[in-house]
Amino acid sequence: MAEFRIDPEMELPVLPSRARADVSRKPEWLKINLRTDAEFVELKRLMRGQGLHTVCEEARCPNIFECWNRRTATFMILGDICTRNCGFCAVRSGVPTGLDLAEPERVADACVQLGLRHVVVTSVARDDLSDGGASIFAETIRAIRRKNPFTGVEVLIPDFGGNWDALAVVMDAEPDVLNHNIETVRRLSDRVRSRAKYDRSLELLRRAKEMKPHVSTKSSIMVGLGETMQELYEAMDDLRAAGVDIVTFGQYLRPTARHLAVEKFYTPAEFEHLREEALKRGFAHCESGPLVRSSYHADEQSAQAVARRTGAGRAAQTGD
């Protein structure tokens, strides 16, 4: 079959091709300039001083410099060894050891020291724990609230193996945003996500919204794994049916040769098309771009939720 290339100037929508694009080299729009200025080095030193892990580093996020300079960060709690082995993820897999009960307070202290405006708390999957780590998520949210009441808090959670009592523990702690990623379209889910289930993820998002309707819910999709545009439309429809408020789209980039191959690099025009389609479907917000990751510009996405939560307290402090 002839190779199919998309002119960035062509009119959308773009009909997908099953032919694999030339992915031997990254296109120009995926190239970034890495920076290690003094502020970045200081932030990294403070993270290490607290004995904390960030998914920004563990997952080799291309936006780490921008986000840290915006005073936003994504902490990875419950250790740095995952009990699952997803085909796209750079985080180490294996058998975790122990549970650090002091970690929530250290994360909260780091938020103060770093002056964070917004924090995302995520974790490795901990299928070895009866609640999947939900209680540590909840205590981390509460610890941040006690010490940083005006810092936005988003949690990016695993599926807890379908343990809805564990989900309720997290929701009762009242995060500003509850994020759980479906990662890919239904057809590819079993190949891409180790031990996760597409419909179980949708059920988690639906239940989270039912438990706390005022908490924004969010999910993310990687593109470039062999999905079609129609399948992406269907995934958006599935997320909206589950009551999801925010969706993000980003280009899948292969961490190592051992991970799933990139099937296609999407153009900036195609990402803009996905954003438009998401907004048409009623999502309150959509981030869509080649370098977008789940937590990209998370501070902007949750600003309204934080304002609702802290409005009364801020008014009391100022006497308004």
Curated annotation (Swiss-Prot):
Cofactor descriptive note: Binds 2 [4Fe-4S] clusters per subunit. One cluster is coordinated with 3 cysteines and an exchangeable S-adenosyl-L-methionine.
Co-factor(s): [4Fe-4S] cluster
UniProt catalytic activity: [[Fe-S] cluster scaffold protein carrying a second [4Fe-4S](2+) cluster] + N(6)-octanoyl-L-lysyl-[protein] + 2 oxidized [2Fe-2S]-[ferredoxin] + 2 S-adenosyl-L-methionine + 4 H(+) = [[Fe-S] cluster scaffold protein] + N(6)-[(R)-dihydrolipoyl]-L-lysyl-[protein] + 4 Fe(3+) + 2 hydrogen sulfide + 2 5'-deoxyadenosine + 2 L-methionine + 2 reduced [2Fe-2S]-[ferredoxin]
Pathway per the UniProt entry: Protein modification; protein lipoylation via endogenous pathway; protein N(6)-(lipoyl)lysine from octanoyl-[acyl-carrier-protein]: step 2/2
Region of interest: Disordered: 300-320
EC numbers, comma separated: 2.8.1.8
Low complexity compositional bias, start-end: 303-320
Pfam families: LIAS_N, Radical_SAM
Location within or outside the cell: Cytoplasm
Signal peptide per UniProt: none
Top-level taxonomic group: Bacteria
Entry GO MF terms: 4 iron, 4 sulfur cluster binding; lipoate synthase activity; metal ion binding
Database matches in Gene3D superfamilies: Aldolase class I
GO cellular component term, pick one: cytoplasm
InterPro entries: Aldolase_TIM (IPR013785), Elp3/MiaA/NifB-like_rSAM (IPR006638), LIAS_N (IPR031691), Lipoyl_synth (IPR003698), rSAM (IPR007197)
Stored NCBIfam families: lipA, PRK05481.1, PRK12928.1
PANTHER family the record matches: LIPOYL SYNTHASE, LIPOYL SYNTHASE, MITOCHONDRIAL
Name of protein: Lipoyl synthase
Organism: Symbiobacterium thermophilum (strain DSM 24528 / JCM 14929 / IAM 14863 / T)
Gene: lipA
